[in-house]
């Protein structure tokens, strides 16, 4: 169940169902960008939108992306040997233009907000992003994104 737990209305129910259908001794696992702690690759845009007074993109169950919540959900589903860990990745763009072309698009949770913005508002967003992004001397941008992962075994 990769990168979806925050979009599920009832994560506990979904995990319980996965635990039910996986054979005894099988593994139930997921990973999700840590959306509440800024681990999402789109976190810079989300922060800029918030700074500019735009609504933060939200998912149905953002708290489910947290390691402690994942641990609790897996244990509540009766899974054993539950482990959580963090997956860290560098996010790199060759230029600010590449960053914008890849991320200010009318899809996903950020796109739900940016697609409703006027051209002036998009320019304000870009100005804010230029201020906050770590732009290197060569114009490239690199920052870290991180996801939390969890796994547990079905008893038996």
What label would you give each PLM region?
Residues 1-12, 34:
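A short SAM/SAH-binding and catalytic strip from SAM-dependent methyltransferases
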Residues 1-3, 29, 147:
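Short SAM/SAH-binding signature in class I
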Residues 5, 34-36, 61, 89-90:
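Short histidine/acidic/glycine/proline-rich micro-motifs that form metal-
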Residues 9, 23, 154:
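Short conserved AdoMet
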Residues 12-27:
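A short glycine-rich, Lys/Arg-flanked "PGG" loop and its adjoining helix->strand segment in the class I
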Residues 27-54:
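Conserved class I S-adenosyl-L-methionine
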Residues 59-156:
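Conserved Class I S-adenosyl-L-methionine
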């Amino acid at each position: 169940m990769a990168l979806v737990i925050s979009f599920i209305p009832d994560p506990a129910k979904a995990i319980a169902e996965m635990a039910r259908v996986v054979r005894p001794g099988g593994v139930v696992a997921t990973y999700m960008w840590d959306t509440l702690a800024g681990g999402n690759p789109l976190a810079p845009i989300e922060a800029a939108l918030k700074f500019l007074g735009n609504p933060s993109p939200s998912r149905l169950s953002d708290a489910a992306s947290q390691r402690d919540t994942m641990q609790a959900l897996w244990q509540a589903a009766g899974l054993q040997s539950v482990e959580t860990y963090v997956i860290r990745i560098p996010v790199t763009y060759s230029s600010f233009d590449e960053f914008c072309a890849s991320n200010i698009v009318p899809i996903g949770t950020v796109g739900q907000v940016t697609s409703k913005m006027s051209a002036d508002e998009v320019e304000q967003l870009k100005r804010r992003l230029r201020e906050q992004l770590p732009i290197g001397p060569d114009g490239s941008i690199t920052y870290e994104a991180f996801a939390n992962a969890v796994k547990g075994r079905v008893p038996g």
